[in-house]
Amino acid sequence: MLNPFQLLFYSQLLASLTYFIGAAIYALPVPVYGVKKWAPRLITDSIYVVVWNSIYLGVLLFLGELLSLLGVTWDGYFSWLNNILYIEQSLYLMVKTILTASNAVPEVSALIQVVPFGALLTVITSALTFTSTLIAVSKIVYQYVAVFIATGVLFLSIPFRIGRSVGGAFIGSGIVFYVGLPYLPQFLAAFQMLPTQELNTPPQNASAIIDYYVHVVPSIITSLVIGPVIYIFILVGFSMGVASLVSGYGSRLPLIIDVF
């Protein structure tokens, strides 16, 4: 596992190199604006990286405080995801059993003519794949958020702003997804898209199966696929905004530093 403090150490070295390059460009006896303009930029970039190194631990503590203010925890979020995964696996097993029994039981075979269980199985499989992927991504964000931010600072420290956009993307994604992902259940609840208790109650007869398909399948699609996907896209948008803020706009940095 990468050590975030080692990454910050390397970023500090690169920041020092960037500063000395800027100072050297200032001292060049070449009155060419295209060259001289890099001197203040490099010096401000190096100071900006030093600021990020200084507030690194404070940023991590601030993220924890944001989670507390939102009233969410990663443990609760993972518990919710595992419960969703259990529901999807139960639904998959139920539909798979019905499809298997259709070859031997005429009543079940007739039921399949009414209810398109093949399409239902495809929907459940898609939801199962999405939830499994979301769990894997969430674990990566939870375990490596410190590394993401430190890697972003390292890219910010590369001279001549070569890695500025990449560094901003690492920092923005780490911050937004670490705070935003655990809020997914609350987001779905706010728009009444949480999985209903009916999803966890398998039907007992043919008429119940038809009713289950008519009323519950839309809930499967909205609560297990559409809702989470919309929320992920919202987080992506926020992370892009934070990335732009961190890396600056055009030739400007978000930190106001005057270098003469």
Swiss-Prot record:
Coiled coil: none annotated. The chain crosses the membrane at residues 13-33, 47-67, 110-130, 140-160, 169-189, 220-240. Keywords: Cell membrane, Membrane, Transmembrane, Transmembrane helix, Transport. Disruption phenotype: DNA transfer is completely abolished in deletion mutants. Deletion does not reduce cellular aggregation induced by UV stress. Induction: Up-regulated upon UV stress. This is DNA import protein CedA. It comes from Sulfolobus acidocaldarius (strain ATCC 33909 / DSM 639 / JCM 8929 / NBRC 15157 / NCIMB 11770). GO terms for cellular component: plasma membrane. The keyword Transmembrane helix applies. Its main location: membrane.
